[in-house]
Amino acid sequence: MARVKTGVVRRRRHKKVLKLARGFYSGRRKHFRKAKEQLERSLVYAYRDRRRKKRDFRRLWIVRINAACRLNDLSYSRFINGLKKAGIELDRKILADLAMNDAAAFAKIAEAAKKAL
């Protein structure tokens, strides 16, 4: 049986890795072994940070809501409790957007939360 060389398969595999390594610095873009190692790390970071992004945004929204609540003489926890008692079902993303872009509307919501307490 004739010996099979991996020329075509290797070329495809290397091209696939080097294509994904575009944008990396120096040898991590040009050399297959370095590119492959960096690509593995990069994919791990990407997987981890897709989950972390959800936590980070939630924290950011809470900070923004808390800052707006304090301008309306209310703490964040009391504000959220008041919203639940008032039956206002707005998520934190929407509340944070209102706090940043429409302070008057947020003040009305804060008043409704205060009354429900």
Swiss-Prot record:
One of its GO terms (biological process) is translation. Pfam families: Ribosomal_L20. GO terms for cellular component: ribonucleoprotein complex; ribosome. SUPFAM superfamilies: Ribosomal protein L20. It comes from the Bacteria. One of its GO terms (molecular function) is rRNA binding. The keyword Flavoprotein does not apply. Keywords: Ribonucleoprotein, Ribosomal protein, RNA-binding, rRNA-binding. Binds directly to 23S ribosomal RNA and is necessary for the in vitro assembly process of the 50S ribosomal subunit. It is not involved in the protein synthesizing functions of that subunit. Belongs to the bacterial ribosomal protein bL20 family. HAMAP family: Ribosomal_bL20 (MF_00382). This is Large ribosomal subunit protein bL20. It comes from Campylobacter jejuni subsp. jejuni serotype O:2 (strain ATCC 700819 / NCTC 11168). The gene is rplT.
